[in-house]
Amino acid sequence: MNNFKSTALGLVKWIGLIALSLLINAAPMLFLRLGKNLPIYAEILLVALYLILVYLIFRSLWQRYQKRVPEEKKKFKLSGKDIGFAFLFFFFARVAAIAGVYLNLILSGNSQTSNDSAIQGLGGMMSSQHIFFALLFVATIAFIAPIMEELIFRGFGTAFFFKNNQKVLPAIVTSVVFTLPHITQLTEFPIYFALGLVLYLSYARRGNIKDSMLVHILNNL
């Protein structure tokens, strides 16, 4: 019974964190769409408030996540070897993405996923008149989203439900959950599921979420 309660509570927390991640990712997109007529001072204020809020949220979540990480893993740092592995996993992620794009093209006739098309559409809305919103949008795609998604999907997703010696089940579960918010069609599932598996493997190599954060950042740059 206690195990069921713990799992149910973990599920509620995880869903809440995923919703938080989606809101953080969506805010800069809303700024671009709805902030066309805002004066420059309002734009700067919104960007500053967003960055402060994201920093406070991340710091709070990171502190809570660290309580679930074994002491020996807290001391792990990124060495040259680890950066090399990150680029290797990044290569695997690109191969998986290219294969997934071709599969999506065969199955649906679309050469891009709906998520990529939406991002490119928003990118086309960027202008020098709203440079701060544009820079925030780029920073979110390249850095903020990868860091928050790794902490929430793979970090907390693994910590809430799985033991340290479990690998296959958490890889599948976290990759499926990571995939669902990123797709609008089933034909897009293999692309993001494969990316999720690569990101999980980069994390599971030594149990350091910073590794998958780096791979995810490289993939989004």
What kind of region is each of these model predictions?
Residues 105-130:
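Membrane-interface interhelical connector segments
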Residues 11-15, 44-45, 83-88, 123-145, ...:
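Hydrophobic alpha-helical transmembrane segments
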Residues 1-103:
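N-terminal, membrane-interfacial amphipathic/helix-forming hydrophobic leader that caps
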Residues 148-173, 201-211:
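Membrane-interface helix/loop boundary segments of multi-pass membrane proteins
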Residues 34-50, 132-137, 165-174, 184, ...:
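Membrane-interface starts of transmembrane alpha-helices
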Residues 26-29, 172-175, 179-183, 187-221:
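Functionally important transmembrane alpha-helices
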Residues 46-54, 140, 191-199:
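Hydrophobic core segments of transmembrane alpha-helices in multi-pass, intramembrane catalytic enzymes
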